[in-house]
Amino acid sequence: AEKDIQVIVVERGDFPGSKNVTGGRLYTMPIKTMAGDMLEGAPFERKIVRERWSLLGDGNSIGIDFTSEKFRKEDHSFSILRATFDRWLADRLMEKGVFVIPKYRVDDLLWEDGTVAGVKAGQEEIYAHVVVAADGVLSFMGEKAGLKPKMTPHNYAVGIKEIIELPEDKINDRFNVESGEGVAHLFLGDVTKGLFGGGFLYTNKESVSLGVVVGVKALMENKQNIEAHALMDMFKERYELRTLIAGGRLSEYAAHVIPEGGYGGISKLSGNGIILTGDAAGFALNMGVTVRGMEFAIASGIMAAETIIQAKEANDFSEKSLARYETKLKETFVLKDLATSKTMPEFLDNESFFNFY
């Protein structure tokens, strides 16, 4: 918008963020340089200063608790609530001249001579030189544009999340942190009853985000006929969890499909008049002890914007012109990190990680 390009965001929710779900952690270090002042004053919940990992057995567990003064000195990562964060970010964009249209669902793409020329939302037709598809892991826009590879249940997981409200002082005491400081805690093992996946907990200012993620293929094939919501209920009843959330009030319940294909699950990133970003492009990385995605989405959005600015200057929105987008991403942490960890999905496909070990 600052480059005198009209930008329209079509949002199907009541407001930006109302339909978005995340575990709750944004790694800001990788995007600090490219984001500039974009995140200045952002409504972060807590700076993550403690890392915890737990292996859960049937009635027992073992864990690792790691903290470092470096975490306190540097803005490495933060817990966030998407409904708050995305709404704030949208307000900043509108101040810069971006049009945000809420309560509209994009139903189809508009085409002209084999090129994506806009979107259809209800009875409205919105024409554009470039459509940036940021419609999530199942991206029907990417599919309609012929950019999404044929995916299988193996490439997806489903996440169940709850937000439990607790007073700030109780969170500080129970998690041994000071105000403004937070904990990221990941769980493996009995939390998914031996299925591919795990559990998570992130502390917010006055709430805790916790949930379970389990592979879609594992759910379909499990002989125990366990459902994701049942895993969530059992997770909350474990001693390791119930003592941390005791007395809390459930304020939000959500579910979300998550890309698990890694580098091999990345879509074709651009075509004539269209670019895919974030989950729609498959930009997510599960390394077992670390789960990343939001910083990939932000970085890909920035690279998409730079590509469109160059395309506008050349008045060329063809697939060849927009291919600069992938070239730019290869020079950033997004495709570099995904390529470095490209064997991780196969590595984590070993069932022993979630039961025997």
For each of these PLM feature ranges, what is it?
Residues I309-Y357:
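C-terminal helical "tail/cap" subdomain of flavin- and related membrane-associated enzymes
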Residues T192-F196, K205, Q224-M303, D316-T332, ...:
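FAD/FMN-dependent oxidoreductases across multiple families
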Residues E74-F78, R82, V116-A117, P149, ...:
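Alpha-helix N-cap/helix-initiation motif
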Residues I302-Q310:
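Short glycine/serine- and small hydrophobic-enriched flexible loop segments
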Residues E2-K3, I8, R12, A83, ...:
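Predominantly flavin-linked oxidoreductase catalytic cores and closely associated redox partners
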Residues S61-R82, G118, V213-L219:
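Helix-loop-beta segment of a Rossmann-like dinucleotide-binding subdomain
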Residues I5, R12-G59, K161, K336:
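N-terminal FAD cofactor-binding segment of flavoenzymes
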Residues R174-N176, A246-G248, D337-P345:
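Short coil/turn segments at secondary-structure boundaries
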